[in-house]
Amino acid sequence: MRIKRREFLKASAAVGAVAVASPTLNAFAQTGTGASAMGEAEGKWIPSTCQGCTTWCPVEFLFRMAVRSKYAATQLSKANNGYCCVRGHLMLQQLYDPDRIKTPMKRTNPVKGRKEDPKICPYHMGMKQWDTIADKIMELRKNNETHKYLLMRGRYSDHNSIFYGDLTKMIGSPNNISHSAICAEVEKMGSMATEGFWGYRDYDLDNMKYLIAWACDPLSSNRQIPNAIRKIQGVMDRGKVVAVDPRMNNTASKAQEWLPIKPSEDGALALAMAHVIITKGLWSKEFVGDFKDGKNKFVAGKTVKEEDFEEKLTNGIVKWWNLEVKDRTPKWAAKVTGIDEATIIRVATEFAQAAPACAIWYGPNMQPRGSYAVMCIHALNGLVGASDSEGGLCTGMGSPSSSYPKIDAYQDDVAKAGAKNKKIDQRGTLKFPAMGSAKPGTGVVTNNVADALLAADPYDIKVAIGYFCNFNFSGTDGARWDKALAKVPFFVHCVPMFSEMTYFADIVLPAALHHTEDWAVIRSKANLHGHTSIQQPVVERMFDVKGVETEITWLLAEKLKAKGFENMYNWLYNEYKDPETGKNPTNSLEFALYATKIRSKKCWDPKENAEYKGDKLNGWADFMEKGIVNSPKFKFRQKWEKGFPTETKKFEFYSETLKKGLLAHAEKNKVTVDQVMEATNYEARGELAFIPHYESPKRHGDVKEFPFSLIDMKSRLNREGRSTNATWYHAFKKCDPGDVNQEDVLQINPADAKKLGINEGDMVKVTSVIGSLTVKARLWEGVRPGCVAKCYGQGHFAMGRVSAKDFGKAVARGANFNDIMPADYDRITGATARNGGFTGVKIEKA
């Protein structure tokens, strides 16, 4: 039986009519009497976890009459103190979205392409989809080609260790590819190269007196949004908040001062601030040290003898000054940043005078040369002694978890051999150091997978699975992904919505939603506390959906066992026993539950948490009811006492940590570090490669032909790219400053619009070096002249009838500007470039 796309939509519409219009809500209700008035006293609050952004807030859902009707933050959470942000409410519409994929489906049109109807039809008999997938994997094993299996990950839980990690190894492939390099990897290098921490920072907002929100919007995106919303006014009352961004975001609109910097000139501003702090003698003597004679010898343009300075907890302050900072004056920076000299001097002085109760909270900085920019920014946190100080910033707290069972005894020789092959994303090659944790080849180069697939370099891929990912939409120059996935012979997509990537799937498996339908464990941190929180089903499933990381693993293992490869099933059956009863799992749901119990055991088992200093629970039922375990509060200055996890055990202005990684990468590829810099498109040569230094912007498009810099911004309503089919997303779009409800717009400064003869609401053609898009113009003073800003999220031709203009005909609603942004990278980290105005565009009336 074949179902055309429009017939599939008609079926969805029938469910939607029941969900939206029926007075009895009989798709969900336990009785046919209809819904009575709902009072606050009715129902039960069930804890789970929101994963709409990278905060991962513990939340609760009010369950009334078999319907999840309300959401709020978990009152026991010390990360958000019971507060939540606006995007969480969209979970209600996501759960009951009539356009969700409801049953496993298969492709019947062998031709793949963006404009090709896949002609999907549902599996009606048994579980044939699992037979098909298992057959493809067995074929790889038979031909000793297990390395040609690829798993691509989007949003995930701790259980990704099972599906993304261990399952891939059991099959025999090195190719588990994370989405993280199109998310926020560059910012991690700022703290990694200076203080040895590869991760997101935490902030002591309760005691902070001066906050610079730099290229990020803590009130809308990035991390710990509810905590920032609740506490930013306190920072302003005690001192000052400054926002650095080419566009007035939510934080900038709240802050006492907004610095509309030119795109990609972040490093210049940071270095000029360092110059001011150093020449004025405002650096932290307690943390950095001082001249032996007590006299400041740092004078603009003049070098200093290293032996004259006695450093304490830092490495290379004088070398950094001599090589770079001495010439980076505010006067120089004013010319390249667009921020006047007096403002640079004043803000730098204010920041240092508030130390150590100050911090720079910086964002992704996903620019082609972003690693060195974030090193410059984070160096300021060290220069004033704010790192690991009360009122400043820190690495944050971890949270308890127990280990997953090991796979070693179950991984056979075929799998071991296959897993030793190179990864498909080309990490570790000369042009992609991809230095996660400053070690070559330990990062990921997500967006480059498309090019690797097209070139079959290092080899071709024959079987691919993707879950909670939509790289054809979320990756820059997405047309590459269209061509690449069209080449893959067999692709399975595990998602809740029919996305742009799903168009290329041979089998579509409907995914359970993390927050309301699945079992999982989530760990995160905010507000100086770490936490482990639960995800659990809060309503009975309406559709034939499965938890990807657990249930799909089990169902696939069952089929592989039936076909003669029983290792995977034996691993799951023997090792994932219920830690309370010792019972072996007998089906996919039991496995999901037991895996969650195993991972969280240290949270709820009185024996395992006996020595834990944070929250203590009394049994699994207690964890299900409370939903969270909070860590103790972070203790400051432990690294001051014990040392930083860098090569020198100090905060590094001259990064021996980065130097070690770059030298290792150069040696592996039989070149010099200078040749690495050249191959990866950085300007640094010699010692500059090891210090925070200025790199001029790398821009696609000559300024004369493409005069405007494109600013890619994020909506406070985006839920990991899967919320645009919610009507509330569009109804409240103006909560993103400068945007318009029910519209997708390009923000243009009125002064620029006047020169172009463009009026409010005009349709404009936006052209880059790789293509053009048409979108509605929005005239707004909140975007810097010479820049245009577009919010990521809209422009779907898939996802559903709200998200697309015409879902049946695959007509997009709005424009996805990833389609005209070239595929480029910060190659030290492997991160995709999307920030810093690296794409030049020209604007014309359509």
From Swiss-Prot:
Arsenate binds at residues 156, 180, 188. Arsenite binds at residues 155, 179, 200. GO terms for cellular component: periplasmic space. Its main location: periplasm. Keywords: 4Fe-4S, Iron, Iron-sulfur, Metal-binding, Molybdenum, Oxidoreductase, Periplasm, Signal. Predicted to be exported by the Tat system. The position of the signal peptide cleavage has been experimentally proven. Induction: Fully induced in the presence of arsenate. Mo-bis(molybdopterin guanine dinucleotide) binds at residue 183. InterPro entries: Asp_de-COase-like_dom_sf (IPR009010), MopB_CT_Tetrathionate (IPR037946), MoPterin_dinucl-bd_dom (IPR006657), Mopterin_OxRdtase (IPR006656), Mopterin_OxRdtase_4Fe-4S_dom (IPR006963), Prok_Mopterin_Oxidored (IPR050612), TAT_signal (IPR006311), TAT_signal_bac_arc (IPR019546). Residues 43-99 form the 4Fe-4S Mo/W bis-MGD-type domain. Residues 1-29 form the signal peptide. Its cofactor is [4Fe-4S] cluster; Mo-bis(molybdopterin guanine dinucleotide). Binds 1 [4Fe-4S] cluster. GO terms for molecular function: 4 iron, 4 sulfur cluster binding; metal ion binding; molybdopterin cofactor binding; oxidoreductase activity. The keyword Iron applies. It catalyses: arsenite + A + H2O = arsenate + AH2 + H(+). Heterodimer composed of one large subunit (ArrA) and one small subunit (ArrB). Component of the arsenate respiratory reductase (Arr) complex, which catalyzes the reduction of arsenate (As(V)) to arsenite (As(III)). Can use acetate as the electron donor. ArrA is the arsenate-binding subunit. Belongs to the prokaryotic molybdopterin-containing oxidoreductase family. May also use zinc as a cofactor. This is Arsenate respiratory reductase molybdopterin-containing subunit ArrA. The lineage of its organism: Bacteria, Pseudomonadati, Chrysiogenota, Chrysiogenia, Chrysiogenales. The gene is arrA.
